[in-house]
Amino acid sequence: MATMPASEYEEPFVTVEEYLRTSYRPDCDYVDGEIRERNVGKYEHARVQALLAAWFNQHEKAWEAQVVTEQRVQVSPTRVRIPDVTLLSLGSQPDVILDPPLLVIEILSPDDTYSDTQERTQDYRAMGVETVWIVDPKTRTGRMCSGAEWVEASRLEVKGTPLYVDLPGIFSQMTSA
């Protein structure tokens, strides 16, 4: 019985430089030479993302933080993640974020797995991101990680800053016209 060489089964290795020169639609994560598709395109995910971005945008000057969505963040020399929502200090930013953001928010999609979500948040924390939030549109809940523990809360905050969001207010807009 003939077998195919192992190289024909493996995903092609992509250098970080090649990844950063390439545009993907939708954009993909880059993990140790592998291009990983993200779960996007579902209504509830997109709606929560838009509502969170609008919330932070209206507080930009007062909170001295700017919001971006689906922005490449290089979390290590061999990994680039695309958070759903990212809060950065005011001012110009590079095309690929290299410094730890003030806040990273991941919005769960129905196809997201626990292990993938954990790996993503560990990457952000290893980069130096002090606070990561996970928002679940299906259960209308949120968790925040600041330090080593995850805490479920309806009001998500970034310790030592004015940054916060009341999730019931966000979720109440999910059905409004």
Which residue stretches match the model-derived regions?
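Gly/Pro/Ser/Thr-rich low-complexity, intrinsically disordered segments predominantly at protein N-termini
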Residues: M1-A177
